[in-house]
Amino acid sequence: MLFIKIEIIAKTLLIINKKYTEIKMDELNVVNNINHAGTWLIRNQELLLRYTINLTSAIIILVVGMFISKIISNGANQVLITRNIDATIAGFLSALMRYIIITFTFIAALGRIGVQTTSVIAILGAAGMAIGLALQGSLSNFAAGVLLVTLRPLKTEEYVDLGSVSGTVLNIHIFYTTLRTLDGKIVVVPNNKIISGNIINYSREPARRNEFIISVSYNSDIDLVIKILRSVIEKEERVIKDKDIIVGLSELAPSSLNFIVRCWSKNHDLNTVYWDLMAKFKKELDKNNINIPFPQLDVHVYKKK
């Protein structure tokens, strides 16, 4: 039936050609060629049907995979943001997840149309290894960025000491972290340097301890000095009273008695409490005629007779 229809189409084309064009065509050759094509289609219709189904399935897999990857990526981004993860890192991780899903979807679609997926995976693996060797330093920073996001030893708006630099954390990117120093400089630190070194976080705890070294002259009354220093501490409202307050003689220095004073205050009050207490210590010691020694140079003049 299909063969008869093809022959009818061939003859119709010949009639149209004779009527509307001046090009002469060999009727027998045209019909034979079309008949051969029709015969091939009849013999391979099952194969063509199978390829059509596989190609359609591959397209459906790609479309569905793209749709699912977008949904999962957006959902992951929202979850990361709700857990107070930096928006830049959340966006990068969600995008990375989307590309991974798309890659596996593409491999599955290729397998559906008969492509050997093992070869594709091998090629992707070799390409990934080459890229990894070329970007070894960047990948180490990327891995360090993932650790910073996961372990969270520091967060934005926290004041940290990274050994070579100290400052407030502005952003934690996937490859680097930016800090603002106390004098307003912006410092970019590779994440690998942060993970491989010591991290001192000054903002994580709500309270911090101030420490003072107060030096007085050797002729001072030790008990009176301790009493004065402790009185100043106890009168300061910003000092946390339920934490240990330590006042004591810590050293007999070459030219002074050194007293150590330790007290706790809220993190955001640390510097102002330190400055105010230092001024109050000096005023109270002066009121009680207790001298604070300072370096002196004795010059002896000898006169020759």
Swiss-Prot record:
<keyword id="KW-1133">Transmembrane helix</keyword>
<keyword id="KW-1003">Cell membrane</keyword>
<keyword id="KW-0812">Transmembrane</keyword>
<feature type="transmembrane region" description="Helical">
    <location>
        <begin position="120"/>
        <end position="140"/>
    </location>
</feature>
<protein>
    <recommendedName>
        <fullName>Uncharacterized MscS family protein BU452</fullName>
    </recommendedName>
</protein>
<dbReference type="InterPro" id="IPR010920">
    <property type="entry name" value="LSM_dom_sf"/>
</dbReference>
<feature type="transmembrane region" description="Helical">
    <location>
        <begin position="52"/>
        <end position="72"/>
    </location>
</feature>
<feature type="transmembrane region" description="Helical">
    <location>
        <begin position="89"/>
        <end position="109"/>
    </location>
</feature>
<dbReference type="Pfam" id="PF21082">
    <property type="entry name" value="MS_channel_3rd"/>
</dbReference>
<dbReference type="InterPro" id="IPR008910">
    <property type="entry name" value="MSC_TM_helix"/>
</dbReference>
<dbReference type="GO" id="GO:0008381">
    <property type="term" value="F:mechanosensitive monoatomic ion channel activity"/>
</dbReference>
<dbReference type="InterPro" id="IPR006686">
    <property type="entry name" value="MscS_channel_CS"/>
</dbReference>
<dbReference type="InterPro" id="IPR049278">
    <property type="entry name" value="MS_channel_C"/>
</dbReference>
<dbReference type="InterPro" id="IPR011066">
    <property type="entry name" value="MscS_channel_C_sf"/>
</dbReference>
<dbReference type="InterPro" id="IPR023408">
    <property type="entry name" value="MscS_beta-dom_sf"/>
</dbReference>
<dbReference type="InterPro" id="IPR011014">
    <property type="entry name" value="MscS_channel_TM-2"/>
</dbReference>
<keyword id="KW-0472">Membrane</keyword>
<dbReference type="InterPro" id="IPR006685">
    <property type="entry name" value="MscS_channel_2nd"/>
</dbReference>
<dbReference type="Pfam" id="PF00924">
    <property type="entry name" value="MS_channel_2nd"/>
</dbReference>
<dbReference type="InterPro" id="IPR049142">
    <property type="entry name" value="MS_channel_1st"/>
</dbReference>
<dbReference type="Pfam" id="PF05552">
    <property type="entry name" value="MS_channel_1st_1"/>
</dbReference>
<dbReference type="GO" id="GO:0005886">
    <property type="term" value="C:plasma membrane"/>
</dbReference>
<dbReference type="Pfam" id="PF21088">
    <property type="entry name" value="MS_channel_1st"/>
</dbReference>
<dbReference type="InterPro" id="IPR045275">
    <property type="entry name" value="MscS_archaea/bacteria_type"/>
</dbReference>
<comment type="similarity">
    <text>Belongs to the MscS (TC 1.A.23) family.</text>
</comment>
